[in-house]
């Protein structure tokens, strides 16, 4: 059975206000094949239960921490933020071609 996505509606409003993007934009990018990486959160000590999506959206790469709720079969998205280093790492060849 496939997992669905969930997120805080309040957090989504804040992100839409501050970043002009929301969780639905991230979910659409993932479902459209723009998931670049899925791994454990790099800071396992501080965030032992979190995972991290690396997602391409428009001209940037966003980091999306999430937790897995196996009981509800949900991936709960915590937040998302653009990451300059990830953008350079994953999109460097595309930028050189332009």
Residue ranges and their predicted role:
Residues 1-98:
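Ribonuclease/tRNase effector modules and their secretory precursors
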């Amino acid at each position: 059975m496939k997992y669905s996505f969930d997120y805080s509606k309040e957090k989504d409003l804040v992100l839409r206000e501050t970043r002009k993007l929301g969780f639905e934009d991230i979910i659409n990018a993932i479902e459209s094949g723009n998931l670049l990486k899925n791994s454990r959160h790099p800071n396992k000590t501080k965030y032992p239960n979190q995972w991290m999506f690396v997602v391409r959206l428009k001209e940037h790469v966003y980091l999306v921490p999430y937790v897995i709720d196996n009981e509800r079969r949900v991936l709960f998205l915590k937040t998302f933020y653009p990451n300059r280093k990830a953008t350079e790492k994953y999109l460097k060849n595309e930028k050189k071609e332009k």
